[in-house]
Amino acid sequence: MKTLLLTLVVVTIVCLDLGYTLTCLICPEKYCQKVHTCRDGENLCVKRFYEGKRFGKKYPRGCAATCPEAKPHEIVECCSTDKCNK
């Protein structure tokens, strides 16, 4: 009986862990509230900052599998918890 109970506990823990999906903010505005569920393999939230020539400051956000390299005059921040790219 103890073996069966232990097996059920282990299976439950494994199944709960497999079902986790990261959520990140996804919008270009400075103050963002739009939440997006990331796809499998996208384990990071990303926030970029740059100043556009025509439309001012931009703050694109989203999900990523790897942290992208910053382009010239750009700041990139990556994190791995839900909605951490504020």
Curated annotation (Swiss-Prot):
One of its GO terms (cellular component) is extracellular region. Keywords: Acetylcholine receptor inhibiting toxin, Disulfide bond, Ion channel impairing toxin, Neurotoxin, Postsynaptic neurotoxin, Secreted, Signal, Toxin. It holds the Pfam family Toxin_cobra-type. Disulfide bonds join 24-45, 27-32, 38-63, 67-78, 79-84. Its main location: secreted. Belongs to the three-finger toxin family. Ancestral subfamily. Orphan group II sub-subfamily. This is Neurotoxin 3FTx-LT. The lineage of its organism: Eukaryota, Metazoa, Chordata, Craniata, Vertebrata.
